[in-house]
């Protein structure tokens, strides 16, 4: 069975944010505004997205 993937896009800048939130964006592989990555839908990735929900948008692929 194929694994689900999520399309995560950074929508807001990380400037002036908490260092842990900036590190979370880096952990997700996001570098700049409008940068999009496709990640596996795992509990750890979901937790990282929940931490920075106000800076990213998520689509199920």
Curated annotation (Swiss-Prot):
GO BP annotations, alphabetical order: translation
UniProt keyword annotations, A-Z: Ribonucleoprotein, Ribosomal protein
PROSITE patterns on file: RIBOSOMAL_L30
Origin superkingdom: Bacteria
Molecular-function GO terms, alphabetical: structural constituent of ribosome
UniProt KW Ribosomal protein keyword: yes
InterPro entries: Ribo_uL30_ferredoxin-like_sf (IPR036919), Ribosomal_uL30_bac-type (IPR005996), Ribosomal_uL30_CS (IPR018038), Ribosomal_uL30_ferredoxin-like (IPR016082)
A cellular-component GO term for this protein: cytosolic large ribosomal subunit
SUPFAM superfamilies: Ribosomal protein L30p/L7e
Subunit structure: Part of the 50S ribosomal subunit.
Family affiliation: Belongs to the universal ribosomal protein uL30 family.
Protein name: Large ribosomal subunit protein uL30
